[in-house]
Structure formats: C-alpha cells, structure tokens
Amino acid sequence: MFLDIVSGYERFLIIVLITFLVSCFFVYQCWKIYISPWSHIPGIATSFPIIGNILSLTSRSDSLKNLDGYHKRLGDTFIIWILFKPVVFSCNIDLFDSILKSSDKDFLEKGSGYETFRDWIQDGIVCSTGKKWQKRRKQLTTCFHFNMLKNYLPIIDSHSQAFVDILKKEGGNVIQDIAKLTKLMSLGIICESATGMNLMNKENEAKLHQYLESLEVVSFLTAERRRRPFYYSNIMLKMMHIGSEYQKAVKTVHAFTRELIIEAVNHYNESNPKSNFLDILSSLHHNGEIDTEGLMEETNTLIFAGHDTVSASLAWLLYNLGMNTVAQEKAFHEAEIVSKMEGSMEEKMKQMKFIECTIKESLRLRSTIPFIARCMKKDVSFPNGMTIPRGTELVLNFRAMHKDNDVWQNPEKFIPERFDGNSSSQRPVFSFVPFSAGPRNCIGQRFAMMELKVSLFHILLNFKIEAVDKESDLAEVLDVVMNNSGGIKLKLSERT
C-alpha cells in the first residue's frame, strides 16, 4: 500500500489533500445544482453561509427600506437567498405580463410565505391552490357580483356617516393613529355585509374590540413569522413565549368568526333571497357544496381581507390628501357638487371622477399590499433572455413597479390627474396593480373601491384634513399590510 511507505506526517498531508479535493468536488456539485441556475441574476454582495441574505429582511423597521435600495442598485430584478431558498424580486413589466395574466397552474401557486397565514385564515381562497382554489373562486365570485354589491352600498354609506360622527367627537385634536379608527369602521362594514347584522352597538362593542385586539396580535406575529424563518415551524413557535400568545389570539379570532357562522346557518332560509356573503355560503353548505371547515376558511379570509387592507388604504389616502391640499380641495369641490345631485348613492358614485383618481394615486404611491409571491413550477424567460428557473420563489414587487421612473413621471409625487382617462391608456396594462391582476386578482376589489369612495366622500364633506408628520418622518413598515411604525397622525378640522 502506498500509505504504508510514507511517513506519518506525509500520510496526514495526503489525507488532508484528498479530503480537501473531495470537499471541493462536493461544494462544486452543490453550487452547480443549487446555485449555478440562478448565478446570472444580480444579487446582493453581502451574503453569509447557510443563512444567505436573511439578515437584511428580519428588521421590521428596515426591511422595506432595504428592498427599495436593492431595486435602485441592482435593477428591476434581483435575487436574495433565504437559507437555501432562492427568492427573486422583480418589477419587470414583461415578467408581470407573463405571470399575472397566465392561467397556467405552474404560475398560480402562492409562495411559501403564505404558509404563515394557515393557522389564521387556513386554506381559504387566499392560500389554497389547484382544483380547490378554482372551485372556491367560482363559488365566491357570486358574492361580489354587481347585483350583490348594490346590497352592500347602503351598509357602506351608513357606516361611513357613523364614522364621520366618531371623527367629530375628536374635536379637532390630533388623532394619533387614524388607522385604528378606520379599522373599526371597516370591520363594521364587512361584518354587516357578511351577515346582514349591524354589530356596531353597545351590546357587541366589547366583543369587537377584543376581536380587533386579537387580530392585531395575530397580524403582527404572522408578519414576524414571515420575517424570521425560525418561527416558520409550528413546533419551534410553540416552544417560545410568543407561540402561546399567538395561539390564544387565533382562538379568539376563530371564536368570533364561528359565532357569526352559527348565527347565519341557524337563520338560513332557502326561500329567502341571498342578500349577503354568509347567505350564499350557507346556501352552498345546505346543498353540500362546501363543508363547515370551508365556511370557517372563507369567512376568516373575507373578514381579514375585507377590512385590514381597506382600512389601511383609507388611512394612507387621508394622509396623502392631508399632505396635498390642492388635490384635497379639488376632491372636496367635486364631493360638494355630487352631494347636491339628485339620485341614489350608486348614481352619485359614478360622478366621483376625481375622487376615484385620488384613490388610485394613493394606492399607487403607498401600496398596502406591496408584494405577492408565486412558486415557479417551471422556467420562465424574459424577452431580454434572462431565465428564472423552476423552484424559484418569485416576488412580484408592486411597490417598485408603482414607482418605476420608466413608467411614471415624478413617481414620488402625489398627482391624481395621472389617472384620468387619457393618461391611463398610455401606460402598460400591468403597471398599476394594487389589487393584483389576472386569475388570482383580488376578488373583492370593486367592494374595496366602493368603500374607499363613499367613506372619502363623507369625510371630505365634513373635514379639512391635515397630515401631522412630514413624509421624511414616516417609517413605513410591512406587517401583514403596510403601516407607519409610529401611526398615521392626522388633524381633522370641521368644515363650516
């Protein structure tokens, strides 16, 4: 044997050399299989073994800022590594076009980040995939049909007027976080639209506040789980203090939903017209088309998606108008003219042209859902030749697209006029996607726009809006939706 005729020292060196060469070969094979397919995509220089770039995303206060910086530095598409998972962020318009309009099942599966929602909203329409998602999407579309939306409009109008009364009680003082108040209004709207029952009364006040407090805990800890992968595992989560806090809050949220469902199912009458969300779900349940678990899944999803995103959008809309008095006064004058018109609120809404422009511009400037993620089941190629391999988690960055200099002139400025008919028609189809687009777009987007229009209409008629914080003082953070770390402070002065 060769090793028998060499000294112990030489034998040691040979073993070290062989080990080194085998290790190099192993590392090369790992690189070839796990890294090389993505090596052509620009990436962040600061990366660590095993954990990758995860440290740049774990901070609640800095993660959005970091991602904005990477887009400016690396271009419209770049890769980060979270543990061993490749995550590609993109605001490339051609890629948006390829992915969003596609009905190919290989592009429709949601990214792994949505798994952190499952304890809360379970396998509802937001998280489900495949045939289950297709079936549920078809079933739930009825809930947001044009004729159903007519039923919801008086509810939205009534709660918006009640919201104005709540704001008047503030007496012109600085509201420390308008989002806390808009949440309560939006929750009242979605609950009554879902059940036909107005829960905004003394009898239910404590229950609603408990629900909102628990929902705030669930939302915050869900966002924390997305930022910190070692919280992904339910086993790991249960071993930590926040795990018990999280589970307790989830139980409270589910108990609230369960009570609504029991009430709806007990009062279901097949001969009555279907006038709300739970009427339709109860009908499906009665006919055996959806089980009790499905009722829970979709009701939890509806209440979360129907109030959290809309309330945040309204809060940011009021802030943006508070920062832009010219646009605010123009919107007020339109509201004043519309208020004097004859006809129903439905007819009046059609005349709120500039108000709609301000809403769209606010959704562009501050997207409350700045990203969506898809798991690529096959390769996708850009027209410029770049390929994103299958197995990639692809994050479509709406926030970056909505501020792309190539699409929007002065993208950091609030200019509602860019959404008048002429300007809108000159932009790429998928350059403005606050509700996503294509087969997996937001099923309730028309409901959301109705709520934003009507509530803003009533607020403008009654108040002048003044933003307290300068834009430079904001600290935008991504929880489940985009918020301001210190709250959105406003001063509302009654119009005389």
What are these regions (language model features)?
Residues 54-75, 252-255, 259, 263, ...:
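Conserved cytochrome P450 K-helix E-x-x-R motif and the immediately C-terminal K′/meander segment
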Residues 2-135, 150, 154-166, 249, ...:
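N-terminal membrane-proximal hinge/A-helix region immediately C-terminal to the signal-anchor transmembrane segment
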Residues 55, 145, 217-225, 245-314, ...:
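Conserved cytochrome P450 catalytic core segment spanning the I/J/K helices
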Residues 2-23, 81-88, 147-158, 168-192, ...:
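Cytochrome P450
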Residues 396-423:
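Conserved cytochrome P450 K-helix/beta-meander segment immediately N-terminal to the heme-binding cysteine loop
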Residues 325-327, 445-482:
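Cytochrome P450 heme-binding "Cys pocket" and the immediately downstream C-terminal segment
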Residues 142, 305, 422-452, 476-478:
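Cytochrome P450 heme-thiolate "Cys pocket" and heme-binding signature region
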Residues 186, 190, 194, 249-258, ...:
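Central I-helix of cytochrome P450 enzymes
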